[in-house]
């Protein structure tokens, strides 16, 4: 289970599975290229490397290095700084050396390109900013942490669609006598 959902339900001594049915996906994304090549992107590292090797053997090592580097970004940007408010310039200034070391001045695409040579693989491995409305060519490489975040926790599907997550949260809130105001801005 995605830990944030589980953590929320645990606060109320409830099991998320009683409210929301999430199932881990085996294939996360399917990329179909102009030339007909298909890449099934997943959490299965052996399968990922095999598919990368079929496209460009030299990029397997680059992929492994990219994953290691995105773990460093994840450790800093998600694990360490996710709860830090950047409401004062000094707080941000203290993080500058770390952010520079993590190449935050590069775009996601530029970071990926420093490890991956094949253009198909570059586009595939730099697509993560699109998930949050960003442009891989201009979004800071800090968003590369999404690549590692997926590897750490996987990608899940809400059975019945995302609306069922809302329904499950609403049910929990009603049981906890939390006032809901609906139909208003």
What are these regions (language model features)?
Residues 1, 62, 164-165:
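Residue-level preference for nonpolar/small residues embedded in alpha-helices
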Residues 1-28:
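N-terminal FAD cofactor-binding segment of flavoenzymes
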Residues 4-7, 51, 110-114, 168-171:
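Alpha-helical scaffold segments in soluble metabolic enzymes
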Residues 30-32:
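Residue-level detector of beta-strand face positions
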Residues 34-139:
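Rossmann-like flavin
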Residues 103, 113, 145-185:
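Helical element adjacent to the flavin cofactor pocket in flavoenzyme catalytic cores
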Residues 140-144:
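Active-site-adjacent bridging/hinge elements
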